[in-house]
Regions:
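C-terminal scaffold of the Radical SAM
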Residues: 1-3, 22-50, 64-100, 105, ...
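Flexible, acidic/Gly-rich N-terminal and inter-domain linker regions that tether
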Residues: 1-2, 54-62, 385
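Local cysteine-cluster metal-coordination motifs and their immediate loop/turn environment
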Residues: 9-22
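Minor-groove-contacting beta-hairpin "wing" of winged helix-turn-helix DNA-binding domains
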Residues: 394-398
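Compositionally biased low-complexity segments, especially N-terminal hydrophobic helices
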Residues: 55-58, 106-111
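Short amphipathic alpha-helical interaction segments
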Residues: 370-384
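Short, amphipathic alpha-helical interaction segments positioned at domain boundaries
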Residues: 400-415
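A short, conserved structural fragment
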Residues: 384-393
Length: 415
């Protein structure tokens, strides 16, 4: 089994903090629709090209899909017709068993799998939400970021705080039962009390999943340039701890399981229809992101679209981060990607950076004797400092370890 990621690079405007590859479409409608049509045709053809390549490569036959994720960019910028074509192609290539019920205007898959699409709140109109019913999408990930209109304007977000709440109501009316919302903290001049207010407004929405991150100043972004120019100031370490502690404690009190450094899933609710990737704990939320969990637990995945990454059979590949060049290459039946072989040390380092982010941590039994000895030798002083803990063959971060997780991971890596 493997995950399928499809990158939709289009954004109506660029947020000042975003380091992901994205493009702002042409202002003229005809030009914009032409680029969308060519890009959608290209990602559909890339799926076909990759399937053909895999079927012709000895030992590289891959199994069915366990998750599908449409990310970006802003996938909700696509037309309904484009989204429908993408899913029809997925079904043709990967045989997920789409079942279209035209009478009730719904679509499902023969075997339940998690299918997520990222959306902006202002894209979720009544019509858009109802159109989702006729697609197999069963999970929406929505970027709220903050419930302060002032901070939304600072980020160059196009929506308002009220539109987030309206969008969730529209999704509920369309029978979308699995909604995730992204929230940020650590804005310039943001206080702890303001952060608490954001958390309470989010909890009032009664959603199934929350991703919460500190505001990052990524090199190359407009936000980073503001920081370098001294026009904004990053939050200090003490305020970060207070905000993060508040987040963890309040979400736990509200019935959310923290299963990764930045991700929280509601514990109560329906039984999961999807296979949980890790089974260390008997009690797990049915609303964990199965797609993201596959990254953290070393499950192979295919990335489709400009800048998308793939991992399978000991290889990692990535497509060119240029929409025009990507479209041209695919139209010429070429896969515009580079790849590298993942050696044992790289695989070990990848595991440190991914599995250690999860609440379960690293399953030591999956390591060879050599790497297990190496890891535990480096982990010992960190355990003594209270940053790491071993439980029944799993090595994981403590809460104090989470605060300095980047440093801990760096100390454990093989160089």
């Amino acid at each position: 089994m493997l995950g399928l990621y499809i990158h939709i690079p289009f954004c109506a405007s660029r947020c000042i903090y975003c380091g992901f590859y994205s493009t702002v479409p042409a202002k003229k409608k005809d030009e914009r629709l032409s680029v969308e049509e060519r890009y959608v045709n290209a990602i559909c053809h890339e799926m076909e090209l990759r399937a053909e390549k895999n079927s012709n490569s000895s030992g590289e036959r891959i199994g069915g899909l366990s998750t599908i994720y449409l990310g970006g960019g802003t996938p909700s910028q696509l037309s309904f017709e484009s989204l429908k074509k993408i899913f029809q192609t997925i079904d043709n290539v990967y045989h997920i068993g789409l079942e279209w019920d035209t009478e009730n205007n719904t679509c499902t898959t023969a075997t339940p799998i998690e299918i997520t699409m990222e959306c902006n709140p202002d894209d979720i109109t009544e019509e858009f939400a109802q159109n989702l019913r006729s697609l197999p999408i069963n999970r929406i990930s929505m970027g709220a970021q903050t419930f302060s209109d002032e901070r939304l304007r600072f980020l160059h977000r196009r929506h308002t705080a009220d539109e987030v709440e309206t969008a969730v109501k529209r999704l509920r009316n369309a029978n979308i039962e699995n909604v995730s919302v992204d929230l940020m903290f650590g804005f310039p001049n943001e206080t702890l009390e303001e952060w608490k207010e954001d958390i309470e407004r989010l909890l009032a929405l009664d959603i199934e999943h929350i991703s919460a991150y500190s505001l990052m100043y990524e090199e190359g972004t407009p936000l980073y340039r503001l920081l370098q120019a001294g026009k904004v100031k990053d939050m200090d370490d003490e305020l970060y701890r207070q905000m993060y502690d508040t987040l963890i404690d309040r979400l736990a009190e509200a019935g959310y399981e923290q299963y990764e450094i930045s991700n929280f899933a509601k514990l109560k609710g329906q039984t999961s229809k999807f296979k949980v990737q890790c089974s260390k704990f008997n009690v797990q939320s049915p609303y964990r992101s199965q797609h993201n969990s596959s990254y953290w637990h070393n499950v192979p995945y295919i990335g489709i679209g400009a800048s998308a990454h793939s991992y399978s059979n000991g290889k990692r590949s990535w497509n060119i981060a240029d929409t025009k060049a990507y479209i041209t290459a695919i139209e010429e039946d070429r896969l515009p990607c580079e790849e590298e072989i993942i050696d044992a040390d790289t695989h070990y380092n990848d595991m440190i950076m991914t599995a250690l982010r999860t609440c379960e941590g690293i399953d030591l039994s999956t390591l060879s004797a050599e790497y297990q000895t190496y890891l535990m030798r480096l982990a010992k002083p960190l355990q003594q400092q209270g940053l790491l803990k071993e439980d029944n063959g799993w090595l994981h971060l403590t809460r104090n370890g989470i605060y300095v997780s980047d440093s801990v991971m760096s100390d454990l890596m093989k160089v």
